[in-house]
């Protein structure tokens, strides 16, 4: 399976850094958060990462503009219905993550890969909130 578009749930520090890495690799990425303000803050954070690269001479302004064309925002999870991979990157709250995985299971295509950036919670427990293997 090829990954043509990625979704990241959570526009905090980890989510924005994941979105930056994905877009830097040349893959379109949708950064999803609960509201417009949070999602836009995430987009601004990705732009700031790229601007720091421009300031250091590691990329030029045209490259920054090209990379930012790959980054979009979604206010809620509905904007992730056509992605190939979703990476959940919200706070380490089992109830919240379980709810997100349940919703993603309903919204995303059957062949969409659902992944988590959790470092402390059981991935099996999160996966149990879906109807996927």
Give the residues covered by each predicted segment.
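Redox-cofactor binding/interface segments in oxidoreductases and associated redox assembly factors
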Residues: 87-88, 116
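NAD(P)+-binding Rossmann beta1-loop-alpha1 motif at the extreme N-terminus of oxidoreductases
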Residues: 1-49, 72
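Conserved N-terminal Rossmann-fold NAD(P) cofactor-binding segment
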Residues: 35-84, 94-95, 99
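Short acidic, glycine/serine/threonine-rich loops at helix termini
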Residues: 20, 43, 84-85, 123-130
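Rossmann-fold NAD(P)-binding glycine/threonine-rich loop
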Residues: 93-133
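Phosphate-coordination loops involved in phosphoryl transfer and adenosine-cofactor binding
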Residues: 2-5, 68, 83, 111
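Short glycine-centered segments of the SAM/dcSAM-binding site in methyltransferase folds
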Residues: 28, 85, 113
